[in-house]
Amino acid sequence: ATSALTLVAAQFEQLPEDVQTANVRKVLTFDRSYEYAVLDLPPALTKLTEKVITLSDSVFVPIELGTFAIQGIPAVTGALANCNAKFGGCIVNKFDKENPADTELLEFLKCTLGNKVLNTTIPFSRVIKNSFSYKLTAKEYMKWTAAAQAYEDLAAEIIERLGEE
């Protein structure tokens, strides 16, 4: 899947600027019966991600706690500012509450970014990894797990935050 995403991004980069923008606008034009659209992009600042960010109202950045990931946040928020996109916040992903390092890094992140760190954390879970193999959401695969419930809570928190804007 990663090599396929790389190929798509590489092909996108070869398109003329106006065609890139038109294609991204098409993707972002969705059925108006929906209030929100979530686009999951590769974790790289390519022209594709920059175009999508530029045309988005708010951007939430998932982060797996680790020193390098936290050190990369200023680059991401700087890129968002350059695209005039609103930084909705960080979503802590693959969080292990039993790991003292994760707990310390979460506290550091909260001290650094304050309310830009969402309260909902997505726990590390094999269920999520396994659900991808079956092309199911975590909720469809095993709806009673903590990870599946965390995604429900995350959606509610994001909707609440966007409603406050």
Locate the predicted segments by residue.
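Short, conserved glycine- and acidic-residue-centered signature motifs
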Residues: 17-20, 69, 147
